[in-house]
Amino acid sequence: MAELTTLARPYAKAAFEYAQAHQQLADWSAALGVLAAVSQDDTVRQLLKEPQLTSSAKAQSLIDVCGDKLNAPAQNFVRTVAENKRLELLPTIAEMYEQLKAEQEKSVEVEVTSAFTLSKEQQDKLAKALSARLSREVRLHASEDASLIGGVIIRAGDLVIDGSVRGKLAKLAEALKS
């Protein structure tokens, strides 16, 4: 995973810097999202692994599958990535691009897993509190996991806050063992 990140970082940065310079952050976000989704399709994945195909043929196939969702600079980006035999990195590149974009926009994706369904009011209150703590605009994604017993687990980038009953019981059990 760390190796993929290391290899993908320069491509994500290059795409981000180009998009930022041309005020096309949203367009590039959409294009990279499409490329990531298409490249994860089983049929396309097999095509990209085909040793008989040249890099330019693989790039053109990917561009053809994406159709008009890629503008000329995005198509050139695909060709460059293909020339360097890095098409398998497209999902990681897209993910890293989104992180750079979120950093630029001072926003953060927050995943909240709770034991029970959170009401809209609870989600809004939690988003507001996290926004104040993180000094960023928070985009909250809520999910449910009954195995937590109670409470919530909040994930925002590298930050993890485990306020679940399951987490507290695990800590208590660990303390009793030592």
From Swiss-Prot:
Q: Entry's InterPro entries?
A: ATP_synth_OSCP/delta_N_sf, ATPase_OSCP/dsu
Q: What is its main location?
A: membrane
Q: Which GO terms describe its biological process?
A: proton motive force-driven ATP synthesis
A molecular function (GO) held by this record is: proton-transporting ATP synthase activity, rotational mechanism
Query: What is the membrane topology noted in the UniProt record heading this document?
Result: Peripheral membrane protein
Subcellular localization, as worded in the UniProt entry: Cell inner membrane
Alphabetized UniProt keyword annotations:
ATP synthesis, Cell inner membrane, Cell membrane, CF(1), Hydrogen ion transport, Ion transport, Membrane, Transport
Q: Name one GO cellular component term.
A: plasma membrane
> Is Cell inner membrane set as a keyword in this record?
yes
The free-text function statement in the UniProt record for this protein reads: F(1)F(0) ATP synthase produces ATP from ADP in the presence of a proton or sodium gradient. F-type ATPases consist of two structural domains, F(1) containing the extramembraneous catalytic core and F(0) containing the membrane proton channel, linked together by a central stalk and a peripheral stalk. During catalysis, ATP synthesis in the catalytic domain of F(1) is coupled via a rotary mechanism of the central stalk subunits to proton translocation. This protein is part of the stalk that links CF(0) to CF(1). It either transmits conformational changes from CF(0) to CF(1) or is implicated in proton conduction.
Q: How does it assemble?
A: F-type ATPases have 2 components, F(1) - the catalytic core - and F(0) - the membrane proton channel. F(1) has five subunits: alpha(3), beta(3), gamma(1), delta(1), epsilon(1). F(0) has three main subunits: a(1), b(2) and c(10-14). The alpha and beta chains form an alternating ring which encloses part of the gamma chain. F(1) is attached to F(0) by a central stalk formed by the gamma and epsilon chains, while a peripheral stalk is formed by the delta and b chains.
Q: Which family does it belong to?
A: Belongs to the ATPase delta chain family.
Protein name (Swiss-Prot/TrEMBL): ATP synthase subunit delta
Organism, scientific name = Pseudomonas aeruginosa (strain ATCC 15692 / DSM 22644 / CIP 104116 / JCM 14847 / LMG 12228 / 1C / PRS 101 / PAO1)
Q: Which gene encodes it?
A: atpH
